[in-house]
Amino acid sequence: MSNTQLSYKDAGVDIHAGNELVERIKGDVKRTRRSEVMGGLGGFGALCALPTKYKEPILVSGTDGVGTKLRLAIDLKKHDTIGQDLVAMCVNDLIVQGAEPLFFLDYYATGKLDVDVAASVIKGIADGCEMSGCALVGGETAEMPGMYHEGDYDLAGFCVGVVEKSEIIDGTAVKTGDTLIALGSSGAHSNGYSLIRKVLEVSGANPTDLLEGKPLSEHFLAPTKIYVKSILQLIKQTEVHAIAHLTGGGFWENIPRVLPDNTKAVIDESSWQWPAIFNWLQEKGNISRYEMYRTFNCGVGMVIALPEKEVETALALLEQSGEKAWVIGKIEHLGEGEAQVEIQ
């Protein structure tokens, strides 16, 4: 038995550093506040009232991470936008059902807490919350010695939103003849990064190598686009039948999630050009066309199904919101033995 008096800090957990982090992020948390939020940081739980404008409010929840994009961000010491990625992955999943994000919580885990790094990450989370109009109401910062390599950390996010029951978007309204509108992505968003890192490895490319005048690192770490405010505006003023968020599984797996069983999406491949980074990945990794569309968004962040009569209004609204939007295809009847997504 040792006579040495031990403390939690001796075991690798610095409570003072955790408290310092809380003080550092208070301003970031404050700027995301919504009127429905009750209380501030430090409570055992966060309190949030339902917005009064809803007659029959339905809560919608989602949780996500950023995959191995985080590995790239850590290796390149780029911590200030990965938080936006985290928020985007959660709130974009809510908005496709018509839900307005209300509040967000994060989980940040590391072996040894670096206050500067953590504060930078959480500032990015607050930025994402501000962009999507949801409140950052709390989170968990876990310092766990022996669980992570030096300098590593992990992230997860959880978001709750609300939608009027009569206005839920679930794909059941999709009909043959509907038009499909695409919303442009900002890059690979937060999916396919294990393959991206493999391509970097086998190609011998350096993240500082230039592509269209920008380092590869800038292309790969471009923060995931948040579509919340644009889509909220769209669904207020047009009839939207379905929205698919193109994440893991790409076109082949995400679009069918919002289609009735008797319909298929026919995508016109000539309606857009892949951003240069996707052509680079396909060439350097010798990746098949099918695999590209299964792994990456290839420049398309969202696909929206709506009646043909709404197309002109929808495109104008989306353009006013700053989105790159175009007609990418249509909904047709699904024949026997056919796939629910065709890319022609």
UniProtKB/Swiss-Prot annotation:
Q: Which UniProt keywords apply?
A: ATP-binding, Cytoplasm, Ligase, Nucleotide-binding, Purine biosynthesis
**Which terms in the GO cellular component ontology are assigned?**
cytosol
PANTHER family recorded:
TRIFUNCTIONAL PURINE BIOSYNTHETIC PROTEIN ADENOSINE-3, TRIFUNCTIONAL PURINE BIOSYNTHETIC PROTEIN ADENOSINE-3-RELATED
- Presence of the UniProt keyword Metal-binding in the record: no
Q: Which reaction does it catalyse?
A: 2-formamido-N(1)-(5-O-phospho-beta-D-ribosyl)acetamidine + ATP = 5-amino-1-(5-phospho-beta-D-ribosyl)imidazole + ADP + phosphate + H(+)
Q: Pfam families given for it?
A: AIRS, AIRS_C
Quote the pathway field: Purine metabolism; IMP biosynthesis via de novo pathway; 5-amino-1-(5-phospho-D-ribosyl)imidazole from N(2)-formyl-N(1)-(5-phospho-D-ribosyl)glycinamide: step 2/2
Stretches of the chain forming a coiled coil according to its record: none
* Protein name from the UniProt record: Phosphoribosylformylglycinamidine cyclo-ligase
List its EC numbers: 6.3.3.1
Which gene specifies this protein's sequence?
purM
Q: Where in the cell is it found?
A: Cytoplasm
Q: Which GO terms describe its biological process?
A: 'de novo' IMP biosynthetic process; adenine biosynthetic process
Q: Does the keyword Ligase apply?
A: yes
Superkingdom of source = Bacteria
Kindly report the protein's main subcellular placement as a broad class: cytoplasm
Q: Which InterPro entries match?
A: PurM-like_C_dom, PurM-like_C_sf, PurM-like_N, PurM-like_N_sf, PurM_cligase
Q: Which family does it belong to?
A: Belongs to the AIR synthase family.
GO molecular-function terms, A-Z:
ATP binding; phosphoribosylamine-glycine ligase activity; phosphoribosylformylglycinamidine cyclo-ligase activity
